[in-house]
UniProtKB/Swiss-Prot annotation:
Keyword Glycosyltransferase: no
Top-level taxonomy: Eukaryota, Fungi, Dikarya, Ascomycota, Pezizomycotina
Name the UniProt record assigns to this protein: Autophagy-related protein 22-2
Glycosylation positions in this chain: 88, 91, 235
Disulfide feature: none
Sequence segments annotated as region (Disordered): 9-31, 203-263, 585-607
Subcellular localization: Vacuole membrane
Amino acid sequence: MLSYISAAFQSPSPDEGVQQRPPRYVGEDTTPTSRREILGWYSYGIAAEVFAVCGVGSFLPLTLEQLARERGTLQTSRLPCVGPSAGNSTNATEHGQCVVPVFGLEINTASFAMYTFSLAVLIQALTLISFSALADYENNRKTLLMVFGFAGALASMLFVFIAPPLFVIGSILVVVGVTCLGSSFVVLNSYLPVLVANDPSLQEGKADDGTEMSSFDRDEGDSEGNPWGKDHTDNDSLDGLQPSDQPQSSLEGGMGTKAPLSSSPELQLSTKISSRGIGLGYCAAVFVQIISIIMLLTLSKTKLAKVSATLPMRFVLLLVGIWWGAFTLVTRNLLKTRPGPRLDTVSTKGTGRWRAWLRLVGFAWKSLWETVKVVSKLREVLIFLVAWFLLSDAMATVSGTAILFARTELKLSTPLIGLLSITATLSGMTGAFLWPQVSRYFRLQPSHTIILCIALFEMIPLYGLLAYIPFIKNWGVFGLQQPWEIFPLAIVHGVVSGGLASYCRSFFGLLIPPGSEAAFYALYAATDKGSSFIGPAIVGGIVDATGQIRSGFFFMAILIVLPIPLVWMVNADKGRREGLAMAETLGKSHGGPAEDAQEAEGLLARE
């Protein structure tokens, strides 16, 4: 492992400056992808995934809710929610819900956190779409990655200064952090096609055994110092989507003009790099989460916790921000700029440059709309996107609600919530590897596997609703009445989420017209981000009306089950045939294929 860390401080190899293929545009960097670059790409995943898991998934919603709670009052008695004069009862119905004034309105403190994250996701979606074309030009790709990375890290670090009277500013920092997180990941993924395209193995041919080897694998060789060992999971993510006795070509519509997606050397290499990056990011997140729990346990015994219950969590967010910024700096040193074509060949200075940027923003939205018009003619794709719209909203709603429910209803301590996050994260990693095996063993169709995941996901809100049954409520256990009950549900949530994330994306890929992957994945990502703000906002409104988060489980139970009939209706074979026919139509309308043309993928296509 030390050999990999030391790469950050080594000088680039002289061979890295040698152009290996003719450039497609003036200024294109076609030098071979080096081990340093791959490590730089991994490094940012290690940096930002920590904020995604430890910040967004754990301590940010808790900190925001607690900051508001320390400024809030009980709605009925008007006693402070926190302090010596606060009510001793933990039952919110006895003294009324804890509310805080925000812009003249009284909002439940848990709803305040949910509204904030809902707004953050909405702004993130608008940002992703607007910047989708800009990053493909000049040095914008690396510039945007650094801007988003350092700005997000700074937003996390600044939480250490956010005292309860400044809780509204804390919500602004959440919006900035979440927006930078999502945007930076998409920019990072936009590097992947460039790194793969310039990999020496794809330019020089195949290895002696006929298999593709990336430059990173060449550097590793058979050395015993390889910290990740041999990679036996190089198959594309489409593997396991079909029963073992069903040929992959059955989804190709019999065209036979192109190799199956999973046999593409570029896609195999891209999948290998991506899967390793995700794994390293999750490992880093678990590592920092463990450190965070130790910090919380230590700081809770000091005078800091007596000043404000948020201080230990704010110091954890400081640590998370420092980690994010430090590894972003490593990425800055290792990752090449890899510039795109010039933004404006006529005028690149002054107002002309700004006009060019605005045109690209407009182009991004226009491209998205053009894709929507094409999708409207593809019935199977349209049905699946509607299902994905509902499903992604349900996943975001359950994730955001669970943390606040654990804190406000189950009274879980902050370290235990950190442990809850670790449980869900490790379960998600397990689920990503488990579901392909389950699918092969039971010979499940892709849609059946997705439906099975959704059915298991439905267990979470249904289990929480058991507490409304009188005799179960009298037992005082089951139906999420005891803190320990949420941990088995966290395992279910993690395993199901890991399967849904990978299977839905791969299944959608089977329906895409060949040659339009970038545009359709842009719409897929926009559908994800564009829907994920609705559910949390609705649950926030329900909590405001009822004073209890548990009442939001009714809405979540309905939201989760809605995609099932839609997924069942999708015919993958028919969708693939429609996609191939549409690809032929689009090819004719654009004057035939243009294999040598530059692919304008856009940011959203790589998420």
